[in-house]
């Protein structure tokens, strides 16, 4: 990736910013997906053909027509084919700009979010805004699958390397789902830690658990956005394991009232949003 690209140098991340409390869609800042995908060899014929960046927005508030504050939670799904991803701090600042703005209804807020986010992403964005009462019964769940974290192995290096995946696929062809809660990377711009869980569902030669875990742990000091990490994992698994089918799904912890949950697959549709223990 070209870290000096003007689209990155202009981002508000890591900079002192003024918080606006009146609606301002110009606060949203795009990051071209192409910046990272070119280096990974991802083209318009992506190795994944289904996916989205699913955001949960916990800090959403506006005024009704009488001036009474309203609060809600929004689910946002940005299609993987959009030209841009949306930078998270700008998303937070944009949501803050709703705080002192009057909207006629929850539906108007929903429509406004969808319009602005679609324009910033240059692609399809779906939005669903929920009253708090709709979230009170939402359970805390875990990823389905076999957790590979409880291995008795020695880790001496935390430098990213996909070479950990060399000969990771071995033996018979299986369909299985593997899970790790040890995914940690750093923000591309600020180097702040990003904590996540990752689920890998595949059909292919059985994956060696130790090698896969070492690979995932090697992200620990790696600087990339959430969405880019998931696409890198997908590409590396395709390259080293040649699976018949593959899904990579990560759910990251919340920052600034937002959590980001990228999903990429070549055979499964984007699942319904959920909530995990650290979210």
Swiss-Prot record:
List of residues binding NADPH: 88-89, 255-256
Reaction catalysis annotation: 7-aminomethyl-7-carbaguanine + 2 NADP(+) = 7-cyano-7-deazaguanine + 2 NADPH + 3 H(+)
Keyword Acetylation annotated: no
Gene Ontology MF annotations: preQ1 synthase activity
GO cellular component: cytoplasm
A Gene Ontology BP annotation from the UniProt entry: queuosine biosynthetic process
Gene3D superfamilies hit by this protein: 3.30.1130.10
UniProt-listed Enzyme Commission number(s): 1.7.1.13
InterPro entries: GTP-CH-I_C/QueF (IPR043133), NADPH_dep_7-cyano-7-deazaG_red (IPR050084), QueF (IPR029500), QueF_N (IPR029139), QueF_type2 (IPR016428)
Cellular localisation: Cytoplasm
Catalytic residues (UniProt): 187, 194
Entries under SUPFAM superfamilies matching the protein: Tetrahydrobiopterin biosynthesis enzymes-like (SSF55620)
Domain of life, source organism: Bacteria
Enzyme class: oxidoreductase
Pathway the protein takes part in: tRNA modification; tRNA-queuosine biosynthesis
Chief localisation class: cytoplasm
Positions with a binding annotation for substrate: 86-88, 226-227
Pfam (any one): QueF_N
Assembly and binders: Homodimer.
Protein family (similarity comment): Belongs to the GTP cyclohydrolase I family. QueF type 2 subfamily.
Functional note: Catalyzes the NADPH-dependent reduction of 7-cyano-7-deazaguanine (preQ0) to 7-aminomethyl-7-deazaguanine (preQ1).
Protein name: NADPH-dependent 7-cyano-7-deazaguanine reductase
Gene: queF
